[in-house]
Amino acid sequence: MQTKIKNKRVLVKFSGEALAGDNQFGIDIHVLDHIAKEIRSLVENDIEVGIVIGGGNIIRGVSAAQGGIIRRTSGDYMGMLATVINAVAMQEALEHIGLDTRVQSAIEIKEICESYIYRKAIRHLEKGRVVIFGAGTGNPFFTTDTAATLRAIEIGSDLIIKATKVDGIYDKDPNKFKDAKKLDTLSYNDALIGDIEVMDDTAISLAKDNKLPIVVCNMFKKGNLLQVIKHQQGVFSMVK
């Protein structure tokens, strides 16, 4: 008997660093292809998918501003452009395997992609297209986690999935500490006041105010995204 899928529309957030794979910079084509195939499994199961990708594999606004030459505002805008580069790369990977995809940018770049209009984004999703949201919120000083949460709320997502390199949320970094304990569920308040890194406080507060569940899972496990949406235990953590 097939497991019933409980979430029809989701937003998946990937970090830019994840696209670099084992490299320190750029885009690993093998990682890009893996992510595209994971997204295809969702679409094939009638899940409407929005995507937000960070830009840290190219440039991070905070890091760019540390040298004292580039102002934080300009650094953040540079980071937004990096997310558009990643969005276009992901669009190519998705279309390469047969998925109709649109990129919408919070900053107008009409020669490359659509400008973000939430009603148009929803219409694309209803038609079975994948929508990738680039350029963050379009404003400096906001993270792509906050942008992902904002877009998830605007398009009416059932949940937001933060796809990472670990199986969920831990009380400390599992890559550094062997005794790290996985936390299957966590309240918004615990995520806000604790030392546990899930998303930045703005993103979590926004999710809390709008009762949007946050799921953290391993993006590198084949089939894991679809399992998460089917609510199978043991492969994710949830903040709600």
UniProtKB/Swiss-Prot annotation:
Enzyme class: transferase
Stated role: Catalyzes the reversible phosphorylation of UMP to UDP.
Keywords carried by this UniProt record: ATP-binding, Cytoplasm, Kinase, Nucleotide-binding, Pyrimidine biosynthesis, Transferase
Cellular component per GO, a single term: cytosol
Molecular function per GO: ATP binding; UMP kinase activity
Record entry for activity regulation: Inhibited by UTP.
GO annotation, biological process: 'de novo' CTP biosynthetic process; UDP biosynthetic process
S-S bonds: none
Pathways per UniProt: Pyrimidine metabolism; CTP biosynthesis via de novo pathway; UDP from UMP (UMPK route): step 1/1
Domain of life: Bacteria
Localization, UniProt: Cytoplasm
Residues reported in the UniProt entry to bind ATP: K13, F14, S15, G16, G56, R60, T164, Y170, D173
This enzyme's EC code(s): 2.7.4.22
Binding site for UMP: G55, D76, T137, G138, N139, P140, F141, F142, T143, T144
Family the UniProt entry places it in: Belongs to the UMP kinase family.
Gene name as annotated: pyrH
Protein's name according to its UniProt entry: Uridylate kinase
PANTHER family: URIDYLATE KINASE (PTHR42833), URIDYLATE KINASE PUMPKIN, CHLOROPLASTIC (PTHR42833:SF4)
Subunit record text: Homohexamer.
The keyword Cytoplasm is assigned to this record: yes
Primary subcellular site in the record, as a coarse category: cytoplasm
